[in-house]
């Protein structure tokens, strides 16, 4: 039977705008009732190495609609039909070269044609059929992917609303553009994250996010109350790395030993929007040999929140958040060891303000860039 947790106290990280992932403001178009203006959110995350190449991540948010039906006769005065929104959706365009002009990005969205279909294997899936992508994004990952298959609960807000016999189209409304260093583009292979062994100890990371929402809202019911009264608190876990089990029987592998390992790794966390809302971790110190496969050569790793908690990730599509605290937890890797040992918690994980800074760009990420209707 598992014992109680051992927690090392940590003072709350200082409040700063750099720890936040802000939500898109709701701006309605003046022409056309109930239409949202297309908007861009821009962010810059640099590794601090001037020799590191810069790339751009483009992530899109929008709505799935039924494809309008065409009539037998159409005149030039006929207005384009717009079908009601079925549900919200997210789709990443991936990484590519740095894009300079936000106005061109917004205008280019009119050339996008992405169809949506529902299918199933061992679970429900969504198939994005990329029929047309603007030339502006021809060097991005999405231009090479004519078909994108994904789990429905990760990319569609309410997949249960999509039914058979209806053709659907994805309409992009919001662009989230992240200019970052190329060294930040690293994710751990899923088989490595899922592997468990009695020969190692697992290091998990818990991120406490303060989510902007009203306490009487529906989403607040699935989260903890914020003691500071500034929103709600959500916890998300992911597997950080493994540490080799010590074989020295004369040494105590307790919270002091674990804290020493974490201090030497000099872990720092931040939040961004790359593959959707994403936690970035940087190990600026010594990385143990067993942990090295979980970081790239410069000590970076990205953990998309939708891989660990799809429901929380979808909440963050429309709600802002900030990192309240971060902790590393030492557990047994295999389930038998996990059930018999206590969790050892190291809470002194730094929140990197500069790496999560929305400022430092020549134009405001939340200023209306173009009055374009959501078609």
Swiss-Prot record:
GO MF term list: structural constituent of virion
Subcellular location: Virion
Example of a GO cellular component annotation carried by this entry: virion component
Keyword terms: Viral envelope protein, Viral matrix protein, Virion
Pfam families: Matrix_Paramyxo_C (PF23765), Matrix_Paramyxo_N (PF00661)
Gene3D superfamilies reported for this sequence: Viral matrix protein, C-terminal domain (2.70.20.60), Viral matrix protein, N-terminal domain (2.70.20.50)
GO BP annotations, alphabetical order: virion assembly
Function description: The M protein has a crucial role in virus assembly and interacts with the RNP complex as well as with the viral membrane.
Family of this protein: Belongs to the morbillivirus/respirovirus/rubulavirus M protein family.
Protein name per UniProt: Matrix protein
Organism: Mumps virus genotype A (strain Jeryl-Lynn) (MuV)
Protein encoded by which gene: M
